[in-house]
Amino acid sequence: MSYLGKVYSLVKQENFDGFLKSAGLSDDKIQALVSDKPTQKMEANGDSYSITSTGIGGERTVSFKSGVEFDDVIGAGESVKSMYTVDGNVVTHVVKGDAGVATFKKEYNGDDLVVTITSSNWDGVARRYYKA
């Protein structure tokens, strides 16, 4: 898990605006999120993990255990159920909320991170590419 402790910064994205539209966000919010250049870092502490992300909303740290669902709050304060599963260099985050189920599959490969985003209420696929 050589990716632990590295800070990954967004370098490009594909179809992220389509995913945001499917989630019902306003055009202004979509533009702000698409223009943002977030970072993220994952760390381990025993059998727990934390992901710290920085971006348009400031800094946010989420702590979790692999495979354990928990109550979470995202975006504009929406309460959801989240579950992260860590499997080697792949971290899958499933979010269940009123707007459906979204899956964020994070694949780490050295200094590269590709996040593939799908949703139960959208036929598209979005990708966000990060570099450490």
UniProtKB/Swiss-Prot annotation:
Residues annotated to bind hexadecanoate: 40, 128-130
Pfam families in the cross-refs: Lipocalin
Expression (tissue specificity): Midgut.
MF terms (GO), sorted A to Z: lipid binding
Modified positions (N-acetylserine) in chain numbering: 2
Keywords noted in UniProt: Acetylation, Cytoplasm, Lipid-binding, Transport
GO cellular component annotations of the record: cytoplasm
Signal peptide: none
Keyword field contains Repressor: no
Localization in the cell: Cytoplasm
Keyword Transport: yes
Highest taxon, organism lineage: Eukaryota
Entries under Gene3D superfamilies matching the protein: 2.40.128.20
Description of its domains: Forms a beta-barrel structure that accommodates hydrophobic ligands in its interior.
Described purpose of this protein according to its UniProt entry: Binds fatty acids in a 1:1 molar ratio.
Subunit details: Monomer.
Family: Belongs to the calycin superfamily. Fatty-acid binding protein (FABP) family.
Protein name, as recorded: Fatty acid-binding protein 2
Gene responsible for this protein: MFB2
